[in-house]
Amino acid sequence: MSEERRMRIGVVGYGHIGKYLVDKIVREGANHSMELAFVWNRRREKLSGAVDPRLQLQDLSDCQKWAADLIVEVAHPCITREYGEKFLSVAHFLVGSPTALADTVTEAKLRERARLSGNTLYVPCGALWGAEDIFKMAERGTLKALRITMTKHPNSFKLEGDLVQKNQEAMSNRTVLYEGPVRGLCPLAPNNVNTMAAACMAAHTLGFDGVVGVLVSDPSVPDWHFVDIEVTGGTIEKTGQVFSVKTSRRNPAAPCSVTGSATFASFWSSLLACKGHGGRVYIC
């Protein structure tokens, strides 16, 4: 019997999550019929001595030459905006920075490229508990509202614009940095609110304009990341009763860390689910 073909994985970004995924694929990939196709990082010197030189991709424009079946972006939203279409034209694409999809042009282009290529645009659920249920409610037309509150220590945020100053002022007191549509938050916290962006993709009937995001900076939680999710469904006309779900996720995190500890394992599970689901968006 011939050996089963291994799925070839290209990893774009070699930060904390990228390194974790590369190491997992090298150590355990054979158990899941997968192998590394390439690794790319903006600073190539970071790969020196850590990644086989034969697997180091120098130019993302040449990604098609490496025959990857799945490309995983864990670098920065700008990579997905610039190269997402290219990735989807040659492979399935797991977008680890879904805040990039808050840009309407980027989302539309990637959805269309997935449709035309037949490759799947995967969105990892990350810290979003109940993503599949939220998606099902959206599909049924019963999802009426979704609110996500994310709380971290001030030093765990990487922020842009006006939120930088607001966060600096939050070093002594719990402060709500932002409350409003997630679309407006993504450019201000592109590395911190991927969970909210994933929620917007799952709750596609509400989208980035309808899902409410609340970002809280709290100096009293140096080693935790909190995600509170409030889902509102339909109302029973006769009684006025409203369906609702509330979940609270408490994720241990190293001090000053952007990524909580449980997120790494969640991302690995998402990667294992990327087996090809046709030319569409798939929450995993």
UniProtKB/Swiss-Prot annotation:
Top-level taxon in the UniProt lineage: Eukaryota
Gene Ontology biological process terms from the UniProt entry: NAD biosynthetic process
Gene3D superfamilies referenced in this protein's UniProt entry, alphabetically: Dihydrodipicolinate Reductase, domain 2, NAD(P)-binding Rossmann-like Domain
Annotated disulfide bonds: none
GO molecular function, one term: NADP binding
InterPro entries xrefs: Asp/hSer_DH_NAD-bd, Asp_DH, L-Asp_DH, NAD(P)-bd_dom_sf
Family: Belongs to the L-aspartate dehydrogenase family.
Protein name (Swiss-Prot/TrEMBL): Aspartate dehydrogenase domain-containing protein
Source organism per UniProt: Xenopus tropicalis
